[in-house]
Amino acid sequence: MYEYFEGIVTVITPSYIVVDVNGVGYKVYSPTPFAYQKGDKAKIFIEQVVRDTGITLYGFQSEDDKGLFLKLLSVSGIGPKSALAIMAAEDANSLAEAIEQGEVKYLTRFPGVGKKTASQIVLDLKGKLRDYVARLDRQDEEQGNISPALNDALLALIALGYTQKEVDRITTKLEEVNADTADQYIKKGLALLLKK
């Protein structure tokens, strides 16, 4: 029913966040709740699961992560809580690569995943995550193209107290700047951050 929520993160716990969307607080279970900052505006991709016990919202930072969650749910023996626990225990790229390579032993290290369930995950999903892995690899390559001076500047801005999200918002603009040193990038970055 919901595709995504865009709102202010008001509560962060180890298992869920609360997102205020136009005055309504939605409790959203997330594999990575601490990736969000309290008070920040966030776009969270939502999967609504309806069961006899109630309606539960699960939220993800990207459509790809939501897609991986849905793929895990399609595996016999994996419910929403198990899928969320698996995604919380490992970064999505490593998880998808392990499934694509048929690494049953690797998958058994996740909470609630025994050898039988791990084998079922590989059986059901192997070959279905190639596009996902390729997209993540492309994203990693694009992020790896940042110059050492720009990378130092981004780390310095975080050390100055700016959040990762704030720094991420200006990274593309800083990549377009013709600068040779980290100091030049920092000055431009501060100007962009103070403009908000």
UniProtKB/Swiss-Prot annotation:
Keyword DNA-binding: yes
Subcellular location per the Swiss-Prot or TrEMBL entry: Cytoplasm
Main location as per UniProt: cytoplasm
Residue numbers spanned by region Domain II: 62-140
Keywords recorded for this protein, A-Z: Cytoplasm, DNA damage, DNA recombination, DNA repair, DNA-binding
Entries under Pfam families matching the protein: HHH_5, RuvA_C, RuvA_N
Entries under InterPro entries matching the protein: DNA_helicase_Holl-junc_RuvA_I, Hlx-hairpin-Hlx_DNA-bd_motif, NA-bd_OB-fold, RuvA, RuvA_2-like, RuvA_C, RuvA_C_sf
UniProt region (Domain I), positions on chain: 1-61
Region (Flexible linker), start-end ranges: 141-149
GO MF annotations in UniProt: ATP binding; four-way junction DNA binding; four-way junction helicase activity
Biological processes, Gene Ontology terms: DNA recombination; DNA repair
GO cellular component, one term: Holliday junction helicase complex
Domain III, as annotated region: 149-196
Annotated NCBIfam families: ruvA (TIGR00084)
UniProt-listed HAMAP family: DNA_HJ_migration_RuvA
Function: The RuvA-RuvB-RuvC complex processes Holliday junction (HJ) DNA during genetic recombination and DNA repair, while the RuvA-RuvB complex plays an important role in the rescue of blocked DNA replication forks via replication fork reversal (RFR). RuvA specifically binds to HJ cruciform DNA, conferring on it an open structure. The RuvB hexamer acts as an ATP-dependent pump, pulling dsDNA into and through the RuvAB complex. HJ branch migration allows RuvC to scan DNA until it finds its consensus sequence, where it cleaves and resolves the cruciform DNA.
UniProt record similarity statement: Belongs to the RuvA family.
Domains: entry comment: Has three domains with a flexible linker between the domains II and III and assumes an 'L' shape. Domain III is highly mobile and contacts RuvB.
Subunit comment: Homotetramer. Forms an RuvA(8)-RuvB(12)-Holliday junction (HJ) complex. HJ DNA is sandwiched between 2 RuvA tetramers; dsDNA enters through RuvA and exits via RuvB. An RuvB hexamer assembles on each DNA strand where it exits the tetramer. Each RuvB hexamer is contacted by two RuvA subunits (via domain III) on 2 adjacent RuvB subunits; this complex drives branch migration. In the full resolvosome a probable DNA-RuvA(4)-RuvB(12)-RuvC(2) complex forms which resolves the HJ.
Name used for this protein in its record: Holliday junction branch migration complex subunit RuvA
Organism whose genome encodes this protein: Lactobacillus helveticus (strain DPC 4571)
Taxonomy of the source species: Bacteria, Bacillati, Bacillota, Bacilli, Lactobacillales
